[in-house]
Amino acid sequence: MKKFLSLVIAAMAICPSVFAAEVAEAEAAAEAAPQQSTVEKILAKMPKVSGYLQTGWNYTSNDKATSSSFQAKRLRLIVDGNVGSKVSFRLQIEAFNGIAGSTNGNGQKNIQVMDAFATWAPLDAFKIRAGQFYTPLGYENSDISPATLETVDFSNIVYRMACRNPYEYNLVDYGRDLGVMFMGDVGDSGKGFKYFHYDVALTNGSIPCKDDTNKSKDIYLSATIRPFKNFNIKGTFNWGEYTSTKLAGGTGAASTVEGAANKYNPMTRCVVGAWYNDPNGIDIRGEYGFMNSKVKGEKVVEERGAYALVGYHAGKWLPVIRWDMYKDNINPLSANNYNRILLGCTFQPIANVKVPLNYGLSLYNKDVETALGYNKHHQIQLMGLFKF
């Protein structure tokens, strides 16, 4: 009888602990896999809306003129969504488009469609993009956006090479084009990055949202090699044939040789660069680019550009210094022939807010000084960028 009572007491002592363990395991499982509500499931399938506003103050000064103005610089609305398990789309709209020739009749900025493309991604190594998208010409046109750029403005490699076509669109646009692009990432490092990325694109070549003016198509060949995590080397080559076009914002380049039809003018662009960026340390990037066109032996386009940027991520602060230059050998007396030094610092108090302060000094040679009436140009930019 004593043995029986002892067994009963032992069983009663063990049962609560076993039951408690089972309850704890069940609760842990419930916490690890919470079930989505119907509303959450619907929201998860809806397109994601994001964007940013960049606004602030801009001051410029030279020996002939001075300006001071608050600016509505950029207002981007971005919509990302999924058409299926392997097909996504993006729509990006710029609501403060102030490009010369594209403002309304009163000189006000208007709305411009920037991105409108779909991407099919069956594999990491092979993806197809179709629609209007950013071309892979240089880091600042495809790997960086105004929201992630270390300064307020890009270098002229972007503005005058990637965002401009001297023949068909001789003013600065947004570096987009209509066409199809094949891309992919290969060579898994096992450390969270791939060793090689490629882009191969066929586009109209006119840059903005326009049909092609001839039967020829632009070709882009781009490769990025990443030997280790924070460093990569990129090179992009572009070739196309273009029609000389006159627009409200700028007259296209044209050959003066007798008999030149100016409908299939060949032009090449090339940009190469290297970038090391430690999110908690130093940021170093440099690029060199050129753009050439020759028609019946005549040089119609011959431009060169380069920049070097050094910055340091110090918590909420990012101080930078950038040198950049540009040379237009066809128009040697224009303000696009310069050397420029930029000093800047960006304060980021929270993840979605950036406040960059930039000072830029542009220097011109004697020939440009004679044409412009001044040999240097100052600029101060204080901007706030607010993401949502």
Question: At which residue positions do the language-model features occur?
Answer:
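N-terminal periplasmic/intermembrane-space "pro-region" immediately following the signal or transit peptide
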Residues: 4-54, 59, 388
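Alpha-helical transmembrane segments and their juxtamembrane interfaces
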Residues: 12-13, 95, 139, 297
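Residues in and immediately flanking transmembrane alpha helices
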Residues: 15-16, 98, 145, 364
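Outer-membrane beta-barrel pore domains
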Residues: 23-27, 42, 61-65, 84, ...
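Outer membrane beta-barrel
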Residues: 38-205, 213-220, 224-233, 309-320, ...
